A protein has these predicted regions:
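Short polybasic linear motifs
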Residues: 19, 23
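Residue-level detector of alpha-helical hydrophobic segments embedded in or interacting with membranes
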Residues: 24-26, 217
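N-terminal hydrophobic alpha-helix used for membrane targeting or insertion
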Residues: 9-14, 175
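Conserved N-terminal beta1-alpha1 strand-loop-helix module at the mouth
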Residues: 32-259
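A cross-taxon signal for low-complexity, glycine/charged-rich
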Residues: 6-7, 17, 260
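N-terminal amphipathic/hydrophobic targeting modules at extreme N-termini
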Residues: 3, 16-18, 28-31
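Extreme N-terminal basic, low-complexity initiation segments
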Residues: 1-11
Length: 260
């Protein structure tokens, strides 16, 4: 109750406005880009990102299924990690309108520079403990989104205030490590006021699969959904049939929502 009152109070709006102005002083204005892929907000059409692609077969299957963005993991401990050079080869297979998302976790300046030099990334995904200032510093004016590791009592308002200049917020489950655990979080715990205000740049992740993505879309109406382990036959191994079925489930959910 207190959170809902806070979200609608005049005092909260004033604090939010001051925080945004302070953020501009620290990291500059949030870059606005016209995305053809992942972050094109189009009511009635949920965008789809498939993350952790590692081979040309993965990329070709995702594109054939109608994906809007593919994610490449630049985090060596991950079983889905790829090198910048491999990512560059895979990105060259993408048609116009499909975003190449670069996922990094607490990358050093040198690591980030190597990725940027090799691969044509169109959207950066900061999935570690990066501060807003660090995200803006690394992205250097390029589009970026920040992953939120959502657990019990997660402070949604604080997060969106802190990272208010991100192009998108990616909601993932709080698990050991940094994502890819295939564990959903409690979508009902997301405050409706927060959803209403931020839905045009919310990317929902965390344990999505062909069986639950329809419910997730019906509840939250996110701009996009993000899947990785939910379309795998074993850890790190994507399945073309599951990728196609996942996107079909998203389109079915969109059609159902539009008809209501």
């Amino acid at each position: 109750m207190a959170g809902k009152l806070l979200a609608t109070s005049k005092g909260y709006r004033e604090v939010r406005a001051r925080t945004k102005e302070r953020a501009k002083e620290i990291i500059g204005p949030r870059p606005y880009h016209s995305f053809m892929g992942l972050l094109t907000h189009s009511p009635g059409r949920t965008r789809v990102k498939i993350c952790g692609l590692m081979s040309s077969a993965d990329v070709d299957s995702a594109v054939s299924a109608g994906v809007d963005a593919v994610g490449f993991v630049f985090y060596p401990p991950s079983v889905r990690a790829v090198s910048p050079n491999i990512a560059a080869q895979l990105i060259s297979r993408l048609p116009a309108g499909v975003d190449a998302v670069g996922l990094v976790v607490n990358a050093t300046d040198e690591q980030f520079a190597a990725i940027r030099a090799a691969a044509s990334i169109t959207l950066w995904q900061f999935h570690g403990d990066e501060t807003p200032e660090r995200c803006a510093q690394l992205a250097a004016g390029e589009p970026w989104m920040k992953a939120a590791r959502v657990g019990t009592g997660f402070a949604f308002d604080d997060f969106s205030l802190q990272y208010g200049h991100a192009n998108a917020f990616l909601l993932d489950a709080l698990v050991e490590g940094y994502g890819g655990g295939g564990v959903p979080f409690d979508w009902q715990g997301i405050p409706q006021t927060w959803v209403s205000e931020n839905a045009p740049r919310v990317v929902l992740s965390g344990g999505l699969n062909v069986h639950n993505v329809g419910e997730a879309i019906a509840r939250l109406h996110p701009c996009a959904v993000d899947v990785s382990s939910g379309v795998e036959i074993s850890r790190g191994v994507k399945d073309p049939a599951l990728m196609a079925q996942f996107i079909q489930a998203v389109r079915a959910a969109d059609a159902k929502t539009s008809s209501q």
